[in-house]
Amino acid sequence: MARETEFNDKSPSSTDDGMSQSHFSDKLKNLFHFRRNRAATVSTSVRNDQRDNDSDDSTFDINVNQLNELDLNDSSDQLDSRPSLRRVSSAPDSHKGVEAPPPRPLINMSNIRKAQVKILKNPGNYIFGRTEYGKRTYSGNSTKISRVEVTPHSFEKIRLLGQGDVGKVYLVRQKSNHRLFAMKILNKREMIKRHKVNRVLAEQEILTKSKHPFIVTLYHSFQSRDYLYLCMEYCAGGEFFRALHSLPKHILPEKDACFYAAEVTAALEYLHLMGFIYRDLKPENILLHQSGHIMLSDFDLSKPISIVTHPTVVLPKHSTFSQEKPALDTNSYFSNFRTNSFVGTEEYIAPEVIRSCGHTVAVDWWTLGIFIYEILYGTTPFKGKNRHATFSNILYSDVSFPEYHGAPNVSSTCKSLIRRLLVKDESKRCGSVAGASDIKQHPFFRHIQWALLRSMKPPIIPKIEDGMEAVEPSDNDNEEEDFLNSQYLISANLPAVDMHSSTPVNEQSNPFDSFSSVTLHHAGDE
């Protein structure tokens, strides 16, 4: 949940959750002034995370049509007078004027005694949602959805894993079987206030439908009067971001970067085939399973399409790269589909998003290029001294690669893929012809056996003793309010609305009516 930055171009007439761009611009036009007349502005907001506890929900007007090199030295640029958006991989808290905290160790056995965790003779059989990676079949009929079988009282809270502006994530243990889960608890009042109801509904839809080894698994979802609960697989390896920053220079050798890029590509391909644009790829949103394989998480910025078409096949002669077999066209699902939402992470945002001209599934391939660059070089390619400069670089600067003495050794083949993924024109970007098939056919992945990714040994294996990560109880007694003291909705048969409102319940609309309270059984987990 670290370094989480969100931009929102909100339009009441669109299917995305939020307010109109012009409304924000009119309301905030006196806050910031640039020397030049602006042709167009976009609104941005800061989404806080566990390392940014400011509750400031500030918005900004920033010029995207007149960014140029002269603007980078413009002393009238007032953006830096506001809280900086998070996106400095080496110092995520630099905007606060404090030293970035060191990466949390993957294992700290001294804290286990604090948690008073009972380690049984064979803890792997009961601690994790999956006892052995790859045991699940992921077949189309491997998931059984039934009426929810748990309540908040079915779990014991161990500690707080992270928090955002509308909720928290806890490490919990199910009392009946001692299995560990990550439970996301979202405050309904805050979601309504911040116009994020549709986002959690989209996230639940993705988690409920997904059956993929590189996407985090949902086991239970339910709600109380005041909160929504998503009980998901606990990835004991933690954030990929933290694992990366525990390495020398915070980088990976090219061979290892290729492995993780391949797993991310496979996960994105699956999401696209399911009709979802991810839109927020970054190391913080990638978790490490205890086996070392990756799992994508945090789908609240993802965009589902309303109508999913049948897939098509691209013949070899039409493919971007030479290949022996026809390629499955994952782009065909998004034919004639564009969305105007302004969402993402500052240094990962694609040019078409900044220009507010609408975007397609191609934004995911842009973020893949940024991701590969970052894990190879320890920084992102277009990062500027401030947000204004970063956006200018994204729009107008070509990607460059460090060539100083001691710079990471990266092959021309790898650089070729990064350049192809970071083409400004989305219609010419790698992936524009057949989607994921284009990326998978690039020579950079020539040694990857895509069907056997789950069987490959990951470069980073989390050091977890006795099946446990460092676990310790939280010292904040107020956290019990959202965990146990909420009135359980299903058993009490209460409406999913704000019970504290002065408006009678029968007159309130129910924005959470489509939030499904279900339990999912996965073949291979029992």
Curated annotation (Swiss-Prot):
Residues 65-78 have a biased composition (Low complexity). The active site is at D280. Residues 1-24, 39-106, 499-526 are annotated as: Disordered. The modification Phosphoserine is found at S154, S341. GO terms for molecular function: ATP binding; protein serine kinase activity; protein serine/threonine kinase activity. Its EC number is 2.7.11.1. This is Serine/threonine-protein kinase ppk22.
